[in-house]
Amino acid sequence: MDNLENRVEELEMKIAFQDGTIEELNTQVIKLNNLLASQQDQLRILLSKLHAVEPSNMASQSEETPPPHY
């Protein structure tokens, strides 16, 4: 009977440890999810600002004349 009690106690300790680990992982997932949402918002803002910028007076790469050594 003592062996069975030891096995049950060991299983209970493992479950308690796993519960703590799951809670820590859940906390990290929540933090990362919030960080991702914030970064997505920032990217959305940057993209809207980028699209709003007027094109520059510089010629595009395809319109540039090649340098003299070509």
Swiss-Prot record:
InterPro entries: SlyX (IPR007236). HAMAP family: SlyX (MF_00715). Belongs to the SlyX family. This is Protein SlyX homolog. It comes from Shewanella pealeana (strain ATCC 700345 / ANG-SQ1).
